[in-house]
Amino acid sequence: MAREWPMTHPSNHPMDHHHQTLQAHLASQGADADCAAVIEALADAARELARQIAIAPLSGIDEGAATVNTDGDIQKALDIVADNLMREALRRAPVAGILSEEGDRPETVNEAAPLCVAIDPLDGSSNLQNNISVGTIFSIRPRGRDVLSSFFEPGTAQRAAGFFVYGPQTCLVLAIDRRVDLYVLHPTLHEFILAKSGIRIPQDTPEFAINASNRRHWSGAVRNYVDECLSGAAGPRGRDFNMRWIASLVAEAYRILMRGGVFLYPADSRPGYREGRLRLVYEAHPMALIMEWAGGSASSGRARILELSARSPHQRAPLIMGDVRLVRDVDMLHEGVEPLFETSDAPLFARRGLFR
């Protein structure tokens, strides 16, 4: 039976309303039963993963020997723990196949099941020793003619998407049925409780997030955008911008949802980065769905992320996401730019700007 829990204010005075559990809210909103079962399975795994992350400095699991996964990324002991927890939970749900960052190819679970899940079990694990928020990112999509091809459909095929954040609070941001909701894990009830429904990205926030240390590798279009922001009120944009960079995709996305602004992880000229660095299927696609259903946008700089299809399970893509107008500004600077990467003094980029 779906449950509702009375909440208690930190002052120990009861609040004047009830907050629904994840299970109760999904049921009350008429969510598809199969999608709901997958989301609840992921929430079960996230509860245990949050516990293990919280005690990692005491258990030593965050100091385990690092290996390299099939995609060439450093894999910590907690990455493997997270992957195992998520897979075990999903095997009990109506899931045909699982594509994880930690595996080479999709795992077939039950070919007769209706859904497939793409997942980054522990995004940003390198941040753990610095006590920075990390997360789990997931995409739920219908099973196609076979498990592998299901993950090669465009992002518009997704039925739901979301991410867990393991930080000051453990929370779930969930995009389902064209809305985005926030749930927080109650520390004593051990339930994900609805905290905010129908999230909309605040508009016109003058903030951008990018790793500025890579400036020398950026395309001229990205350099021009950042330079115009940094020029402040005296520059072509006529206002002062703040710059953010947490180096945690889930934390950056959460901030965008709460505060607005734009996040950029563009392609750059380094080997292995020319098609972007984030994975399309289990990072860019789910983030794009969340952004769009919260009234924002997500682009590669040249195309809508949700219209892109992967050619391989771990294909990478650039990601620019956030406020519709700010994302559009970045896109406009990319229009007609071929090739994308030029020397910093190329005449095209010396002249081209959004306002000139």
UniProtKB/Swiss-Prot annotation:
Which top-level group of life is the source organism from? Answer: Bacteria
Binding residues annotated for Mg(2+) 1, in chain numbering: 101, 120, 122
Q: Which UniProt keywords apply?
A: Calvin cycle, Carbohydrate metabolism, Cytoplasm, Hydrolase, Magnesium, Metal-binding
What are the names of the required cofactors?
Mg(2+)
Indicate where this protein is primarily found. Answer: cytoplasm
Q: Which reaction does it catalyse?
A: beta-D-fructose 1,6-bisphosphate + H2O = beta-D-fructose 6-phosphate + phosphate
User: Which family is annotated?
Assistant: Belongs to the FBPase class 1 family.
- Quote the protein name from its UniProt record: Fructose-1,6-bisphosphatase class 1
